[in-house]
Amino acid sequence: MHDAVTRPTPPADATAWPRRITRAVKIGSVTVGGGHPVVVQSMTNTDTADIAGSVKQVADLWRAGSEMVRLTVNNAESAAAIPRIVDKLRMMGIEVPLIGDFHYNGHQLLAAEPACAEALAKYRINPGNVGFGKKKDLQFGQLIEFAIKYGKPVRIGANWGSLDQSLAAQLMDENSQRDTPWDAGRVLREALIRSAVDSAERAVELGLPRERIILSAKVSGVQELIAVYRDMASRCDFALHLGLTEAGIGSKGIVASAAALSVLLQEGIGDTIRISLTPEPGQSRTQEVVVAQELLQTTGQRAFTPMVTACPGCGRTTSEFFQELAGVVQNHVRAKMPEWKITNPGAENMTLAVMGCVVNGPGESRHANIGISLPGTGEAPSAPVFIDGEKSVTLRGENIAYEFIELIDQYVERTYVRRAG
């Protein structure tokens, strides 16, 4: 692994570093890399052979904002199901690129099910388990031949948990000959990067254009992921897919993903992301999409829905009303965004503030496009509303929530030019 990685000089203003220049990869209707916006993707956890269940979950993920969806293709039944899943989604008006996740037997499944090979928008290949011993190069080559034949891009995704053991052993042997050996973690990171990058170069030798290759090298640790991607980004110009192998459950998974990916994104590294959350019992699979969107929006990479700022509350706030109002506002703009995206483009950039007392309320409200400062303890029972930095109106009574929502809708219609449906 390199002793030093050259990274862009941080900008002097409050912006992220310039995006790393990568090759653009066309995946169905979506373009990854080449300066295009960072793409959100997700993965189903259904049995792919369960066509109805898989269609429903893909549709749910797509409606939540996933721009590509990956499905496990691990046996003949799941491979045969893929074309039917694509057809049913199209009948619903959903044209989302589907990615086939192959391990161990992808070369056999694509050979046996050409309709699957055609229906998928991209193939994911794991160089650590595509084949073993003498079969590795042969089976990897067969997968690349299918990608060439059907004009499909591939993601060559190395994983910490399924690392090419022969490569790892080779690098461990080489490391033992160094005057100052690296620690084991550094050797394994090098093996992970080499597995992905060398496999990509092999695919190019076999005839797959560089513009059809995306790389990933996933681990579960935050610092390890940052180190791996910084190094890998310095070695190639392939588009990169970011994500922890397993982020975890609940807040731990969200925090781990945000800690790792936000650093890389701020440094201009990463062209597509997935937040690999373990859903809690009864929790929707779509949470990983929402978290991915919020991560990209809070780091200034993209805008998906108006941002709502709300204070956390303290002893100065007299009730939970401002918290309830913040929730109502957030739910309202999320529900309206699919319509606004079509009829009022730009509404996703709107900022809103729902504050609970006079200390920061008026100031935060002035910074937002629309903000409301609700009364705190000992304050007059009135709620001034600020629009684009100027006090507009003061709301009172029991209909504050309804009236504030009306002001938001009116602002959208007035500010973001309506397009004919």
UniProtKB/Swiss-Prot annotation:
GO terms for biological process: isopentenyl diphosphate biosynthetic process, methylerythritol 4-phosphate pathway; terpenoid biosynthetic process. It catalyses: (2E)-4-hydroxy-3-methylbut-2-enyl diphosphate + oxidized [flavodoxin] + H2O + 2 H(+) = 2-C-methyl-D-erythritol 2,4-cyclic diphosphate + reduced [flavodoxin]. Its cofactor is [4Fe-4S] cluster. Pathway: Isoprenoid biosynthesis; isopentenyl diphosphate biosynthesis via DXP pathway; isopentenyl diphosphate from 1-deoxy-D-xylulose 5-phosphate: step 5/6. NCBIfam families: ispG_gcpE, PRK00366.1. Converts 2C-methyl-D-erythritol 2,4-cyclodiphosphate (ME-2,4cPP) into 1-hydroxy-2-methyl-2-(E)-butenyl 4-diphosphate. This is 4-hydroxy-3-methylbut-2-en-1-yl diphosphate synthase (flavodoxin). It comes from Xanthomonas axonopodis pv. citri (strain 306). The gene is ispG.
